[in-house]
Amino acid sequence: MDHSMSKKLHDEALLHIVGGVNSPSRSNKGVGGGIPVTMERASGAYFYDVDGNKYIDYLAAFGPIITGHAHPHITEAITKAAQNGVLYGTPTKHEITFAKMLKEAIPSLEKVRFTNSGTEAVMTTIRVARAYTGRDKIIKFAGCYHGHFDLVLVEAGSGPSTLGIPDSAGVTKSTAEEVITVPFNDLASFKEALAVWSDQVAAVLVEPIVGNFGMVAPEDGFLEAVNELAHANGSLVIYDEVITAFRFMYGGAQNYLGVIPDLTAMGKIIGGGLPIGAYGGRVDIMEKVAPLGPAYQAGTHAGNPASILSGIACLEVLQEEGLYERFEKYGSMLKDGIEKAALKHGIAVTVNQIVGALTVYFTEDPVTNYAEAGATNGELFGRFFKGMLEEGINLAPSKYEAWFITSAHSEADILETIQAVDTVFGKMVQDN
């Protein structure tokens, strides 16, 4: 494929934008470098770049585009919002409609509040949990990404009984020491951390199904035990459902798994492609939020008509009968096709697939936590990513990210993708 215009534009972007991109994940650093492809437009399941190349897209903007690009129902809603004014700074009736839709889909959301992003939603749930419990520390799980605010840019110390250390320049040591990080799916480490820091722990922050070191499900009984132990300790449980809400069913991963948190943060899908976040939970906890309570949260663009109407339209599309069964069918087809191609060419892969989301790890071992994901072969993934791009398949540029199937993907797209995987695996073996 010709990428000359993408290269030209990236060179120009480097002169004006830090690193040439507005989010580090777009830089291709995670696949060994190379020029990121600049897209011109997107429609349905397809991307079209500035050089005229067409791709089947599984990036889905890192998750929000579950209905495919430029879905006509969502486009119509956004157009209507633009015509009537995109920002008021006042309440609108649409906020009520959307809040009711979220509550009906995810019953643990007894009250909700809208924000501008998933990062803001998670950040605020922690503040609210602290206000409710009168405690300061949180426990989170290694490798789970919860946004780019200071408190969650923290990595583990030397063990569950030690405090966190900054995972980014600019995060203070004192901030990091408010966080204890333990391995996902490791109940013994969680118990140890809770025992050591017991009456200081305000909340446990967890992705119920991990989406940020690939798709990783909780082991049987893990989330139930986290709930039981946290509540016995007087701590709240916060689910970060920024990736998972409406991903596996019409509702949250909490509905899908049957384990209910005290607070939930959401984003991505619920905006239909526009910036949005939301959080909610038990009434007694949510009443700590201003103007009813002392925990302050506000936003100029929070609940803006454009994002709200886009979100309403997205959820309306997701109510299509049989949609999530189709996601499951196509996800299973991809997993099976990738595994068969890998076996054919003698390449070791592990595919974690949950409904319409999956991750391909270059390893023969199971992946159940961040350490195991980190041990997979990133060099092979980088070659695979670049090979798939040349075959017209757009993936996320990191071994830690997921493939997302959208409502716009067809069975023909899935079969074409499996053929591309077979071709790329063959070339990878040949190149060795």
Swiss-Prot record:
GO terms assigned for molecular function: glutamate-1-semialdehyde 2,1-aminomutase activity; pyridoxal phosphate binding; transaminase activity
Pfam families tied to this protein: Aminotran_3 (PF00202)
Gene Ontology biological-process entries: protoporphyrinogen IX biosynthetic process
Top-level EC class: isomerase
Cellular component annotations (GO), alphabetically ordered: cytoplasm
Catalytic activity line of the entry: (S)-4-amino-5-oxopentanoate = 5-aminolevulinate
Primary residence: cytoplasm
Family matches, as InterPro entries: 4pyrrol_synth_GluAld_NH2Trfase, Aminotrans_3, Aminotrans_3_PPA_site, PyrdxlP-dep_Trfase, PyrdxlP-dep_Trfase_major, PyrdxlP-dep_Trfase_small
HAMAP family, sorted: HemL_aminotrans_3
Subunit structure: Homodimer.
Protein name as it appears in the record: Glutamate-1-semialdehyde 2,1-aminomutase 1
UniProt organism field: Listeria monocytogenes serotype 4a (strain HCC23)
